[in-house]
């Protein structure tokens, strides 16, 4: 919504709706309001809306003990964001991240595969990508395959392809177009990054299922190479997982993924098959995820994966917090920094600026702490 141009103001309607299915015995409208605000807050800090609102039957909300107080807190924090940013833009990395699918700029964030926050088992493992990106320090472009054919823009550092095979999300038959695969191979070979989630570049053709299996270092076993030896061993020691000390959630995942080539490293594995793989291709890098549902930990893994794929891991700590349940947004023009706690528990985190430890913070559950940028 905040990307819409040519309108007087933008407004987002937050959840929950004031409907009887939520405001009923056994319902938890306060819990839903908190959870949805924490997700929305990440995105609003990056690309703010002008207004927020709620919808439904007002009487239901007014009769629920404590709910109005919770909404007053949300509104107060929303105003606080605008007071501190003063209409300025937040800090972003020195490269853009591109989401590649069949819609490109036509649908943009609507390619999230979800409607009204309705859960679908078939899609939640892919939805995490855009949910995570919405609160990250990156300018995000949405490109289609004609954009690839016309020439990948120079300011794009990482291309992400997400979705099931033979869908508009992943690209279907576009992946057997020589112009497309050649352009992306050239992009990565010269130092660009490529991240795939689920069945990226998938289209069975000429003995390959993932048409960029050479770039990603993985392919999917479709029954044609069962007798081919696959020497896949896991080595989780990598920049991408340095903050991670608990099991990674791949959601439903993607079965029968195996690593192949000479320059891959398997970071996570389920039995004999791979779940998280990095690969070097020329001067560039790729990362493959079997699935990536939204969670604070997966946000951190994707953040690190993007900087790794872009070949700029040192840039990550330009502004950085150590605890995976916390995130940081910086407004250079107003010299204000927001550190947010995405957990329902107290969290401690260290704040880094330009690679140097600046402060150690203890944040209350769901807190948004504003500090001065002393840079």
Task: Annotate each PLM feature.
Residues 1-122, 225-234, 242, 248, ...:
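Hydrophobic targeting/anchoring helices
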Residues 130-152:
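A short, well-structured beta->alpha microelement
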Residues 6-8, 190-193, 284:
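A short helix->loop->beta-strand "cap" motif at the edges of active sites that frequently abuts
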Residues 161-162, 359-375:
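C-terminal beta-strand-rich structural cap/linker in extracellular carbohydrate-active enzymes
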Residues 151-173:
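Short, well-ordered secondary-structure micro-motifs within conserved domains or adaptor modules
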Residues 171-246:
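A glycine-rich, often tryptophan-bearing local segment used as a flexible ligand/cofactor-contacting loop or short
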Residues 224-282, 290-301, 306-359, 363-364:
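Catalytic beta-strand/loop cores that center a nucleophilic Ser/Cys/Thr
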């Amino acid at each position: 919504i905040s990307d819409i141009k040519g309108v007087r103001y933008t407004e987002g309607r937050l959840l929950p709706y004031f409907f009887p299915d939520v405001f009923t015995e056994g319902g938890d409208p306060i819990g839903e309001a908190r959870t949805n605000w924490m997700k929305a807050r990440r995105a609003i800090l990056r690309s703010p809306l002008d207004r927020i609102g709620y919808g439904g039957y007002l009487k239901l909300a007014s009769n629920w003990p404590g709910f109005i107080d919770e909404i007053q807190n949300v509104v107060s924090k929303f105003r606080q964001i605008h007071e501190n940013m003063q209409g300025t833009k937040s800090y972003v990395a020195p490269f853009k991240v591109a989401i590649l699918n069949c819609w490109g700029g036509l649908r943009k964030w609507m390619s999230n595969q979800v409607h009204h926050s309705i859960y679908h088992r078939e899609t939640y493992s892919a939805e995490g990508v855009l949910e995570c990106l919405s609160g990250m320090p990156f300018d995000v472009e949405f490109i289609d395959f004609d954009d690839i054919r016309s020439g990948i823009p120079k300011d794009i550092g990482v291309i992400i392809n997400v979705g099931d095979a033979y869908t508009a999300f992943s690209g279907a038959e576009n992946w057997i177009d020589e112009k497309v695969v050649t352009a992306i191979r050239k992009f990565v070979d010269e130092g660009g990054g490529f991240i795939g989630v689920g069945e990226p570049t998938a289209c069975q053709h000429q003995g390959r299922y993932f048409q960029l299996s050479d770039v990603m270092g993985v392919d999917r076993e479709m029954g044609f190479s069962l007798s081919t030896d696959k020497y896949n061993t896991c080595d989780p020691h990598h920049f991408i997982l340095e903050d991670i000390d608990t099991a990674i959630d791949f959601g439903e995942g993607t079965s029968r993924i195996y690593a192949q080539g000479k320059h891959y490293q398997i970071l996570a594995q389920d039995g004999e098959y791979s779940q998280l793989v990095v690969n070097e291709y020329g001067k560039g890098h790729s990362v493959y995820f079997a699935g990536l549902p939204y969670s604070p930990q997966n946000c951190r893994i994707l953040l690190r994966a993007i900087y790794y794929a872009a070949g700029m891991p040192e840039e990550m700590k330009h502004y950085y917090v150590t605890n995976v349940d916390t995130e940081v947004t910086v407004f250079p023009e107003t010299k204000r920094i927001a550190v947010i706690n995405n957990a329902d528990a107290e969290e401690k985190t260290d704040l880094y600026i330009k690679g140097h430890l600046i402060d150690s913070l203890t944040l209350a559950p769901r807190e948004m702490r504003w500090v001065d940028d002393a840079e």
